[in-house]
From Swiss-Prot:
GO biological process, one term: mitochondrial electron transport, ubiquinol to cytochrome c
Function noted in UniProt: Component of the ubiquinol-cytochrome c reductase complex (complex III or cytochrome b-c1 complex) that is part of the mitochondrial respiratory chain. The b-c1 complex mediates electron transfer from ubiquinol to cytochrome c. Contributes to the generation of a proton gradient across the mitochondrial membrane that is then used for ATP synthesis.
Cellular localization per UniProt: Mitochondrion inner membrane
Keywords for the protein's UniProt record, in alphabetical order: Electron transport, Heme, Iron, Membrane, Metal-binding, Mitochondrion, Mitochondrion inner membrane, Respiratory chain, Transmembrane, Transmembrane helix, Transport, Ubiquinone
Co-factor binding comment: Binds 2 heme b groups non-covalently.
Gene designation: MT-CYB
Protein's recorded name: Cytochrome b
TM segment ranges: 33-53, 77-98, 113-133, 178-198, 226-246, 288-308, 320-340, 347-367
Length: 381
């Protein structure tokens, strides 16, 4: 008799995805982040669901309802801290996952990569609307500044911004619809993640060498289930340390004050995971130019497969590309730092040079490095 997990219609899918899946034998810890992102999503959906049971999406009571969750609801403080810091862990894993994809050439699985970029955009949208919900000062002003960017679109901009707001400014209608979006988007993310996996399993995983691994594969379970479990332990340790010992470390002190449309905070800035994009947005004095640069900074990921010029897939044996990759990493960290600084010298000039280097590296230097490495590998005799 056939094993049930191989014959049952539902168990068969799970078996082919997580148990008997043929996996390259040499994938490193950099391949752990996919499963960690899945765990992050589950944590966020569960904590978010329980928070939504006690939250009210009304401008008069939203701030109080969050305080009520932290003070009066059983373990409400823990749910809130896990949810807020879980978002940070989510983005940390996301950035490392995307970085891994760029370094090892995983973007050559174009469908998987493109759905991944759409996933990244959807998660960013979810985090943005979620940040507005506590209705603190930075929630309100962050929403005002970012939604206002829509008004930079020629001709239809102002109408579009007012349509999103549901009025002439960020108000009750905006908060209510943002809560609706924040509730539905994680389920869309879950569906997209399944499609992401579906396309990944069509081709199989890439591996650090970038060479076709078909000749040497092992079953996912128990080898990689145990490896993912170790990664999960580290993730949970980091999340619990953050949520239990310094839950407000990554938050903004302005969010302890209820939203006040008559009082603007001295420095409006988003959460740390958006600072790199915010720095690129601020680096261009023109409003529309800034918005386009902001979009380009993320959407540029979609054209990375077209910019691959090297004969080798992975950067493992390409030292020049490796150097440029780590310069790009340092550049993104610099952008994150600049995004959190006030608009004054020397931050202005650094904030203008860093985005230029960002686009130069991806669009020009890295493709040229690939061509140069091809040339260097050709026999010269």
């Amino acid at each position: 008799m056939t094993n049930l997990r191989k014959s049952h219609p539902i168990l068969k899918i799970i078996n082919h995805s997580f148990i008997d899946l043929p996996t390259p034998s040499n994938i490193s810890a950099w391949w752990n982040f996919g499963s960690l992102l899945g765990i992050c999503l589950i944590i966020q959906v569960l904590t978010g669901l329980f928070l939504a049971m006690h939250y009210t999406s009304d401008t008069l009571t939203a701030f109080s309802s969050v305080a009520h969750i932290c003070r009066d609801v059983n373990h409400g403080w823990l749910l809130r801290n896990l949810h807020a810091n879980g978002a940070s862990m989510f983005f940390m894993c996301l950035f490392l996952h995307v970085g891994r994809g760029i370094y090892y050439g995983s973007y050559l699985y174009k469908e998987t990569w493109n759905i991944g970029v759409i996933l990244l955009l959807t998660v960013m949208a979810t985090a943005f609307v979620g940040y507005v919900l506590p209705w603190g000062q930075m929630s309100f002003w962050g929403a005002t500044v970012i939604t206002n960017l829509l008004s930079a679109i020629p001709y239809i901009g102002t109408t579009l911004a007012e349509w999103i707001w549901g009025g002439f400014a960020v108000d009750k209608a905006t908060l209510t619809r943002f809560f609706g979006f924040h509730f539905i988007l994680p389920f869309i993310i879950t569906a997209l993640a399944m499609v992401h996996l579906l396309f990944l399993h069509e081709t199989g995983s890439n591996n650090p060498s970038g060479i076709n691994p078909d000749a040497d594969k092992i079953p996912f379970h128990p080898y990689y289930t145990i490896k993912d479990a170790l990664g999960l332990m580290f993730l949970l340790l980091a999340l619990l340390l953050l949520a239990l010992f310094s839950p407000d470390l990554l938050g903004d002190p302005d969010n302890f004050s209820p939203a006040n449309p008559l009082n603007t905070p001295p420095h409006i800035k988003p959460e740390w995971y958006f600072l790199f994009a915010y720095a690129i947005l601020r680096s261009i004095p023109n409003k529309l130019g800034g918005v386009l640069a902001l979009l380009a900074s993320i959407l540029i990921l979609l054209i990375i497969p077209l910019l691959h010029t090297a004969n080798q897939r992975s950067m493992m044996f390409r030292p020049i590309s490796q150097t440029l990759f780590w310069i790009l990493t340092a550049n993104l960290i610099t952008l994150t730092w600049i995004g959190g600084q006030p608009v004054e010298q020397p931050f202005i000039i650094i904030g203008q040079l860093a985005p230029m280097l960002y686009f130069l590296l991806i669009l020009v230097l890295m493709p040229f490095a690939g061509l140069f490495e091809n040339y260097m590998l050709k026999p010269k005799w």
